[in-house]
């Protein structure tokens, strides 16, 4: 079993500008040198081939750091202790010159997909560095057992919806979740004073609606006393444990406000609500990463401990299993209707 560690990340220090009379002096960093570590990121999902992103860490004060692809790493995949594959490096797709260079290098399995009941270990070797590794197994699927909705038609043509995603938390285990939501909407921009024209396409918009769960108590627990400095950490990734709902049935509430689709012109709205069952390691990593980012430049906060389950390295190997339910208003796709995707 890999020993789980807490790696201390120092947030960016707010440097106060000192006014000098006529000169400035460059001060070299003289702290203890920190050796680079291997960074590993991998999220195991059913029906998806195993993919690993690797990188090298670098000191925050390192001069002229330039990210580059690591093409010669050795990335080994084990299942239940048995080596089953050495993953293949995949070059990134060409990007415009003004795009930043990605610091992560992708290594992909040629066909291995994780299955429930097995533990997968990923080992990464790079020249001159300590071998790093992390492991995970797929958590059980927690099925969505129902979707309850209420709707309020607004005078301005918008529809206020409340959706309750129902599920039962298994008793006897510590379970961890993430609530994700996405919308796909089709809008017709033709003249609506005349009948629908097949020459006018329905424009499709897609967006992340996970924020709709922000007001649910398991996502944002209520506090009786507000922090004097209003420093409550937001739940960036919409994750939660079963601490408040252990062994119980629960209905998680999402609140949305969107335009009411005009089905006479083949407009539609689709809302996908995805209940993700995630590993404890992934939960801890997302939770502490969120806190780290939000306290990064806070003047009076302590440095945040960011969780990792990587031995001799940084990052996380996690896993998730999902159950999805869809709310549908209108029909999509419809034969004879032209659709185009919005670039915004």
PLM segments and residue spans:
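Bacterial N-terminal signal peptides that target proteins for export
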Residues: 2-11
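C-terminal motif of bacterial Sec signal peptides marking the signal peptidase cleavage site
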Residues: 19-22
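A sequence/structural signal for flexible, mid-protein segments enriched
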Residues: 24-344
């Amino acid at each position: 079993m890999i020993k789980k560690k807490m790696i201390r990340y120092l947030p960016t220090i707010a440097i106060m500008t000192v006014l000098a009379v006529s000169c400035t002096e460059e001060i070299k960093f003289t702290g203890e040198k920190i050796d680079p570590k291997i960074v590993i990121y991998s999220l195991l999902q059913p029906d998806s081939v195993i993919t690993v992103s690797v990188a090298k860490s670098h000191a925050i004060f390192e001069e002229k750091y330039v990210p580059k692809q690591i093409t010669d790493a050795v990335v080994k995949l084990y299942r239940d202790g048995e080596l089953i594959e050495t993953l293949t490096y995949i070059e990134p797709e060409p990007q415009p010159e003004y795009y930043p260079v990605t610091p992560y290098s992708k290594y992909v399995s040629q066909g291995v997909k994780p299955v429930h009941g097995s533990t997968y270990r990923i080992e990464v070797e790079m020249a001159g560095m300590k071998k790093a590794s992390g492991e995970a197994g797929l958590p059980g699927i927690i099925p969505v057992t129902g979707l309850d909705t209420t709707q309020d038609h607004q005078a301005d043509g918008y529809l206020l919806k409340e959706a309750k995603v129902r599920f039962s938390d298994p008793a006897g285990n510590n379970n961890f979740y993430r609530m994700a939501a996405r919308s796909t909407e089709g809008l017709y921009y033709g003249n609506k004073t005349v009948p629908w024209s097949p020459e006018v396409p329905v424009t499709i918009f897609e967006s992340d609606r996970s924020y709709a769960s922000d007001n649910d108590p398991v996502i944002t627990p209520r506090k009786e006393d507000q922090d004097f400095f209003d420093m409550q950490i937001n739940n960036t990734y919409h994750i939660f444990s079963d601490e408040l709902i252990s062994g119980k049935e629960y209905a998680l509430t999402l609140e949305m406000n969107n335009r009411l689709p005009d089905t006479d012109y083949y407009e539609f709205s689709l809302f996908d609500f995805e209940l993700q069952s995630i590993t404890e390691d992934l939960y801890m990593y997302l939770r502490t990463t969120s806190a780290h980012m939000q306290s990064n430049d806070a003047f009076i906060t302590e440095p945040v401990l960011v969780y990792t389950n990587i031995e001799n390295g940084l990052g996380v190997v996690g896993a998730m299993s999902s159950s999805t339910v869809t709310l549908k208003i209108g029909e999509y796709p419809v034969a004879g209707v032209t659709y185009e995707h919005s670039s915004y």
